[in-house]
Amino acid sequence: MNILIYRYNSICEDAVIRGLKELGHTVYEVILEVENKSPSGQEILDAVVMGMEKSNADIIFSINYYPALSEIARVYKLLYYSWIVDAPVLELYSKTIKNRCNRVFIFDSELYREISVYNPYNIFYLPLASDCDFYQKAIRHASLADVEKYTHNISFVGSLYTEKCPYDKVKNLSPKISGYLHGIMKAQEKIYGYYFVEELLSDELVDEFVKNYDGYYLAGEEDLLTKKRTLAQFYIGNKITAMERVDTFKYLSEKFEVDIYTASDTKEIPKLKNHGTIMTHTQMPIVFNKSTINLNPTSKPIRSGIPLRIFDLLACEGFVLCNYQSDLLNEFLPGEELDIYSSIEELEEKIRYYLSHTDVCREIAHNGHEKVSKYHTYPLRLEQMFRLGEHRRR
């Protein structure tokens, strides 16, 4: 097929393109949003239509969902394939999600169950994938100096979410509501496998939050996104992620030497060793491969799905210790291909065990790498995607 891919510089776009080409497809890239992060609707239309004409495109493809691309595909009678790799993706609640030209693939089974009711024939559950060959090449070419530099007992690469937490911009909430929300967030922080926040938000509470938030994200009149869902997933979900990551690393850094690579401010966690940012495609794989334990606390808006980072870690043959996510159990064996925790106390206990049993870490990391190399590569996942998409109607 001739595939037009609309890019915005997602970390997995290059891997998807390599996978598509390996399957024999011709790929044409629209890079408008790589260069301009806020293009107008007309600019998107012009760039995509020009790309369609140049490539004689059979389908339009993107990482995450773009309502504008769905509308273009509908008008030009093409299929639009989108692979959801993040959460929350509020665009999924656009009225365009009902378009029959859509083929939407969602990595989180809970989110899939929520969204698929709007277009049941054309929305699918599909886990993410691993780019094993690419990452292994980076590891093989690592210098001795880099191996020494990036070898750690316990490491984490990623944001603490403290610098990108929209919840913190709310002003003048009443003490009662502020305290209630804090209690909900502290409770949800400790619970894995079930996201209950939205159930505990009254309409009155949501209205007060919206009233006190300058620039609250509001969906269009015909869209499917409610103010309550926006508050639960976008504002509160990201805030809980920030709280959990700060609390987790503050707790662990008092007991272990923990190395982190992040642009987030870690001054509140003085014993945490923050090395700043690293290069995603060259240095990060070495950290993953050479760390005894790679921690991966999942962003709370990912309710059940396996984050892309876990596939990246396993592709690098890194040992993964992550929180419980229900979808994990469908694809991996805890204690054999990675390991999971359900509380901060269990996390501490498992860290102590694995630091004194590094041979077990290496064996589990090897098993996890073998699993993703065999069953979770991009070419395999993209083949699954197209098989599912081809058997559904427009």
Predicted regions and their residues:
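Catalytic binding pocket for nucleotide-activated donors in carbohydrate/polymer assembly enzymes
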Residues: L4-R7, I11-D14, R18-L23, Y28-K37, ...
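Active-site proximal beta-strand in glycosyltransferases
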Residues: A73-P88, R103-I106, Y125-L128, S155
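Short acidic active-site motifs
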Residues: A47, L69, L92-Y93, T282-Q283, ...
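Structural motif
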Residues: Y6-S10, S62-Y66, V85-D86, I106-S109, ...
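Glycosyltransferases and closely related glycan-assembly transferases
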Residues: M52-D58, A68-Y80
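Short N-terminal targeting/anchoring amphipathic segment
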Residues: I3-Y6, M50-Y65
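N-terminal beta-loop-helix "entrance" segment that forms/cooperates
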Residues: E35-G51
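Nucleotide-sugar donor-binding catalytic core of glycosyltransferases
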Residues: N2-C12, Y121-N122, P127-I302, Q325-L328
